[in-house]
Amino acid sequence: EIRPTLMKKQMDKEVDKHEGIGNFYQCLVHAAHQFKIEENGEHYIIAGWPWFKCRARDMLVAMPGLTLNIGENKLFESYMETFAKAMRDFMNNRKLSVNIYEIDKPDVPLWATWCIQQYAKLVSGKECYAKYGTLLNEIMSYVLAGKHPNLFVHDNGLVYSSGHEKAITWMNSTIDGKPIVPRSGYIVEFNALWYNAICYTLKLAGQ
């Protein structure tokens, strides 16, 4: 319920927040902002309306396009700051301090590296490494040490994951809790991301 005398004030407040839409680019910017959620000082990207929450993989895949491509580097940094808390909580076996779901998916740390790579394209490698080098090194050390519960580096250099009992890739449809497409083994996109993560982290550290 709301007091009728407050309705006009609330309406004016919402109108003031409304973005002007005068061309197609502004429409895209407006659409990008619709996925932006802020709670308790943390910044999230919602995976979709009305029922999805902030999911780690979706957040990382979408982050560059929803921020960097429209000139909002600071918003990217805010999103990444929130994500980094979830990633570090997971890697250190702590209860998550932020509301990001599916942080346990095997490709999430690899997408994080790719996401930071997109940021580096708009700033210098030195600046990117100063801001995210520690996080990148923590992620790579975590994976190489075999600490991830479902992302293992085998002797052939490829990463292996098991998806027989639980959907672990973007093909995540299930029936009775079981994956319809139980993708397991040397999953192609996981290994593409893994190769990219190795090459990029070494390149960035070398700069």
Predicted regions and their residues:
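Acidic, mature catalytic/reactive cores of soluble proteins
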Residues: 1-207
